């Protein structure tokens, strides 16, 4: 799987509970633009309508070589999941106070997939703890690197 774009703040702002790989319904110019790496999911979120899953605010830049049939950049796009996965996501979101966020957009065997996650928001002290752990890990790596020289 080739990662095209990722939501870098997701791991900092949320505890990731479970991941799902979903297909996405796109137009031709959107596929070409995503393959060129011109998409962003930093402000995207997942919602449900009539038992179906949709991603909102996913920004896909207009494809330059496309004619008048170009797509709208932040339109609502349908995600393709199995019924059991949709039921699991809907149940967890309503019951446990969890949210569903997009993590990455990937190219898998010629198909574009969106990895979404069932996540729980972090509090401020959790974020501080994450920063401390990251700093400690970085210092350990630097000290090991210094000893190897």
From Swiss-Prot:
Principal location listed in the UniProt entry: cytoplasm
Q: Which GO terms describe its cellular component?
A: cytosol
Please cite one Gene Ontology biological process associated with this protein: trans-translation
Q: Kindly list the GO molecular function terms attached to this UniProt entry.
A: RNA binding
Q: Which superkingdom, per the lineage?
A: Bacteria
Recorded hits in InterPro entries, A to Z, give: SmpB, SsrA-bd_prot, SsrA-bd_prot_CS
The cellular location(s) given in this protein's UniProt record come to: Cytoplasm
- Could you tell me which Pfam families the record lists for this protein? SmpB (PF01668)
* Keyword terms of this UniProt record: Cytoplasm, RNA-binding
Report the sequence similarity comment from the record. Answer: Belongs to the SmpB family.
What this chain does, per the entry, is described as: Required for rescue of stalled ribosomes mediated by trans-translation. Binds to transfer-messenger RNA (tmRNA), required for stable association of tmRNA with ribosomes. tmRNA and SmpB together mimic tRNA shape, replacing the anticodon stem-loop with SmpB. tmRNA is encoded by the ssrA gene; the 2 termini fold to resemble tRNA(Ala) and it encodes a 'tag peptide', a short internal open reading frame. During trans-translation Ala-aminoacylated tmRNA acts like a tRNA, entering the A-site of stalled ribosomes, displacing the stalled mRNA.
The cross-references to NCBIfam families, in alphabetical order and at most eight, read: PRK05422.1 (NF003843), smpB (TIGR00086)
Q: What is this protein called?
A: SsrA-binding protein
């Amino acid at each position: 799987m080739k990662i095209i774009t990722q939501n870098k703040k997701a791991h900092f702002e949320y505890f990731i509970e479970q991941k799902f790989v979903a297909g996405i319904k796109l137009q031709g110019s959107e596929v070409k633009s995503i393959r060129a790496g011109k998409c962003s999911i930093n402000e995207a979120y997942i919602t449900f309508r009539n038992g179906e899953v949709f991603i909102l605010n996913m920004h896909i830049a207009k494809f330059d070589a496309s004619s008048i049939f170009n797509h709208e950049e932040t339109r609502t796009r349908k995600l393709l999941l199995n019924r059991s996965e949709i039921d699991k996501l809907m149940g967890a979101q309503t019951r446990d106070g969890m949210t569903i966020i997009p993590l990455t957009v990937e190219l898998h065997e010629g198909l574009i997939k969106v990895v979404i996650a069932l996540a729980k928001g972090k509090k401020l002290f959790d974020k501080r703890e994450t920063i401390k752990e990251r700093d400690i890990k970085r210092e350990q790596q630097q000290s090991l690197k210094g000893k190897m020289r």
